[in-house]
Amino acid sequence: MRVASSLFLPVLLTEVWLVTSFNLSSHSPEASVHLESQDYENQTWEEYTRTDPREEEEEEEEKEEGKDEEYWLRASQQLSNETSSFGFNLLRKISMRHDGNVIFSPFGLSVAMVNLMLGTKGETKVQIENGLNLQALSQAGPLILPALFKKVKETFSSNRDLGLSQGSFAFIHKDFDIKETYFNLSKKYFDIEYVSINFQNSSQARGLINHCIVKETEGKIPKLFDEINPETKLILVDYVLFKGKWLTPFDPSFTEADTFHLDKYRAIKVPMMYREGNFTSTFDKKFRCHILKLPYQGNATMLVVLMEKTGDYLALEDYLTVDLVETWLQNMKTRKMEVFFPKFKLNQRYEMHELLKQMGIRRLFSTSADLSELSAMARNLQVSRVLQQSVLEVDERGTEAVSGTLSEIIAYSMPPAIKVNRPFHFIIYEEMSRMLLFLGRVVNPTVL
């Protein structure tokens, strides 16, 4: 797989100082010289048994490093939780406008918005922090959020089996100057790629932007824009490519056409994959839904949420929270099962700026936006659009996306089955960080 050029590839250099401590016995010549030079009458026992200062420094450094690791771990967990909460809130906003298939990346959008937040001040910045649910984390320091996202991206980029790459573009009108401080920070933490463009020549601008996106997404997103407003000053685009391979693939020879119930009255035929084996799952008695884990290589997982009854899938979205998902995960068991799962492909594009406004991020998209950390020309600047397009393809080998203790099995018994033959939700996350990569629902597997 070709790695996109804008993917951040970190290089970490750690310098370790080795300080040797000497243990001198009283019989050694060195010890004799040393002991004779001491004033025993004025020396207390504490002074005599005091540890070498260099050893104390080493111990203090190790303690500080341990505290730092513990702090970053807690902060990373909080970042993942808040990004998930942001994703669930955004799903509810999307559902108010759209009742069909859904696919988007909370992680990708959060990265893009935090990068842009580096260029904001005042109420504009506060609204972004609040809208992303990151206001508490941001209190630790002005660069804590960029640093945390950088660490997460380092984890992803170093895991080749994960098959994830993410990047961001800022298309800026040709007469717009970026402050050097912002440029350096955004490069350091996000590796964002800036493209100068003449928006007044809208057809040329559209062609250039679409060409960049085609190149970076390996042709998965061939056309992002149909038209562009010539008055535009800034367009922010982020993309996410995820080529996940199932840890245990489905056998294509078992895939057959089967019925998928769109609702109580309509049904269609879809290619239905099949596998029998050990699966991890649970059943939520309160919400009457099955939750099934489908693991990928590289420590990622698709969590499938299937309501017991066909027409109830939208009602679940009002209750999706980090705590609910964590409860599901804690109550899962692994056992032998039959799983029927449809092949599908999703391709969705969202005008995220309209959705972000509903989540309280309004000033950024208005004439009162404070982008003074981004440019000296900030008085005349506002963000015009924030777009995200995500492509997700699921087949026997796995997923291609662009934006327990084993139970005892009784011999010869028929294994239970989960048949995903009605609308369902899916959550794709990285196990180690618990970062929510993709979130969505499939209402009709035959429609993009």
UniProtKB/Swiss-Prot annotation:
Identification of the protein by name: Protein Z-dependent protease inhibitor
Phenotypic consequence of M96A: 2-fold decrease in rates of factor Xa inhibition
Reported tissue expression: Detectable in liver, but not in heart, brain, spleen, lung, kidney, skeletal muscle or testes.
Signal peptide, first to last residue: 1-21
Chain positions covered by the region annotation Disordered: 33-70
Species in which this protein is naturally found: Mus musculus
Known glycosylation sites: N81, N184, N278, N299
Region Heparin-binding: start-end pairs: 140-157
SUPFAM superfamilies found in the cross-reference section: Serpins (SSF56574)
Molecular functions per Gene Ontology: heparin binding; serine-type endopeptidase inhibitor activity
Gene3D superfamilies: Alpha-1-antitrypsin, domain 1, Antithrombin, subunit I, domain 2
Site location (Essential for interaction with PROZ): Y265, D318
Function comment: Inhibits activity of the coagulation protease factor Xa in the presence of PROZ, calcium and phospholipids. Also inhibits factor XIa in the absence of cofactors.
SMART domains listed in its UniProt record: SERPIN (SM00093)
Site location (Reactive bond): Y412, S413
Pfam families: Serpin
Membership in a protein family: Belongs to the serpin family.
Residue pairs linked by disulfide bridges in the UniProt entry: none
Sorted UniProt keywords: Blood coagulation, Glycoprotein, Hemostasis, Heparin-binding, Protease inhibitor, Secreted, Serine protease inhibitor, Signal
Encoding gene, per UniProt annotation: Serpina10
Cell compartment(s), UniProt: Secreted
